[in-house]
């Protein structure tokens, strides 16, 4: 890559060519061999620029043509590489040089201000060591004013800008896509389950049976005594449904809680319905008969009315 630094300036005469890559057909606008009689600059064997008069030795012309051939070869190699980037940190732009043909001057385009060492150069001559010397050799790049018409170069400058704009847009799109993928990798997947999600939020209670029967599901079955069962059967014989006041009274008498009395009456009603459905027990006739017998017994035991004096 160091060979590009030795061929930065090729000609200053009328047959100067565009330093932009890919525009070798510009020589068609200026046909003819290389002019050595009117050129004021020449090359020696080591490729350095010497400013002299019109009396140029024939060996310099041969060396000049040889250097041009080598430059064309290197220029072709530069075209085959796709988007070569050079790590130079020079910030001098060729477009700021004071010359008549501004489109003829070389340009460098920065892709991203955050990336210090990456920028796109139209002609491939980008290095930090050579950037301070471009200000003093502005005339060598631009050429003499009026020597080369600016019309053929304006069209190519537009093409270079369009190509550079498309290249910059593609680079920005790639950078934004890569940044988007990095952000996506940092975020956890939405369907991931954590350990704290697997823990049961409402574990079963392990305390004692609370009052009113609000206990755990594995509540121990209540074992009623014979006295408690007898009193509950008597109460069920008189009334299948209890009021709240009567339920509290029976629970206090039998040393039970209100919920236990309520559940016993519910189970007893379900058993009674099952018996009536199977036909083992009369439906409600027995209960009605019992009520009638009790009413008759109460009336018979009541004292008779005293006879009237008229009878």
From Swiss-Prot:
Note the InterPro entries from the entry. Answer: HD, HD_metazoa, Homeobox_CS, Homeodomain-like_sf, HXA1/B1/D1
Query: Which Pfam families does the record associate with it?
Result: Homeodomain
Task: Give a yes or no for keyword Nucleus in this entry.
Answer: yes
Gene3D superfamilies linked to this entry: Homeodomain-like
CC annotations in GO: nucleus
Write out the GO MF terms. Answer: DNA-binding transcription factor activity, RNA polymerase II-specific; RNA polymerase II cis-regulatory region sequence-specific DNA binding; sequence-specific DNA binding
Q: Name the GO terms of the biological process aspect.
A: cell migration in hindbrain; facial nerve development; facial nucleus development; hindbrain maturation; regulation of transcription by RNA polymerase II; rhombomere 4 development; rhombomere 4 morphogenesis
Q: Which domain of life is it from?
A: Eukaryota
Known DNA-binding region? 217-276
Low complexity compositional bias: what residue ranges?
Answer: 298-311
Predominant subcellular localization, coarse grouping: nucleus
Q: Note down the stretches annotated as region Disordered.
A: 267-311
Its keywords, alphabetically, are: Developmental protein, DNA-binding, Homeobox, Nucleus, Transcription, Transcription regulation
Which cellular compartments is it found in? Nucleus
Instruction: Report the PROSITE patterns cross-referenced here.
Output: HOMEOBOX_1, HOMEOBOX_2
Query: What this chain does, per the record?
Result: Sequence-specific transcription factor which is part of a developmental regulatory system that provides cells with specific positional identities on the anterior-posterior axis.
Q: Which protein family is it in?
A: Belongs to the Antp homeobox family. Labial subfamily.
* Name by which UniProt lists this protein: Homeobox protein Hox-B1a
């Amino acid at each position: 890559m160091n060979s590009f630094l030795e061929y930065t300036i090729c000609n200053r005469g009328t047959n100067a060519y565009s330093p932009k890559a890919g525009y070798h057909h510009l020589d068609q606008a200026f046909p003819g061999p290389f002019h050595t009689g009117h050129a004021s600059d020449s090359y020696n064997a080591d490729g350095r620029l010497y400013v002299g008069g019109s009396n140029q030795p024939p060996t310099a012309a041969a060396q000049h043509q040889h250097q041009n051939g080598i430059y064309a070869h290197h220029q072709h190699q530069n075209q085959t590489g796709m988007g070569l980037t050079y790590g130079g940190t020079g910030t001098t732009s060729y477009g700021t040089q004071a010359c008549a043909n501004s489109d003829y001057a070389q340009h460098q385009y920065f892709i991203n201000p955050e990336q210090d060492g990456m920028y796109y150069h139209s002609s491939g001559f980008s290095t930090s060591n050579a950037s301070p010397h471009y200000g003093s050799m502005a005339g060598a790049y631009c050429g003499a004013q009026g020597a080369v018409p600016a019309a053929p170069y304006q069209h190519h400058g537009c093409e270079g800008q369009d190509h550079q704009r498309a290249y910059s847009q593609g680079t920005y799109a790639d950078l934004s896509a890569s940044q988007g993928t990095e952000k996506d990798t940092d975020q956890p997947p939405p369907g991931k389950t954590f350990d704290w999600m697997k823990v049961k939020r409402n574990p079963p209670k392990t305390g004692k049976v609370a009052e009113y029967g609000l206990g755990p599901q594995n509540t121990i079955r209540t074992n009623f005594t014979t006295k408690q069962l007898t009193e509950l059967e008597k109460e069920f014989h008189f009334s299948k449904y209890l009021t709240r006041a009567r339920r509290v009274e029976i629970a206090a008498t039998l040393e039970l809680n209100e919920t236990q009395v309520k559940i016993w009456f519910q189970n007893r009603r379900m058993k009674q319905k099952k018996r009536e459905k199977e036909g083992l027990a009369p439906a409600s006739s027995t209960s009605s008969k019992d009520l009638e017998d009790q009413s008759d017994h109460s009336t018979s035991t009541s004292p008779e009315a005293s006879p009237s004096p008229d009878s």
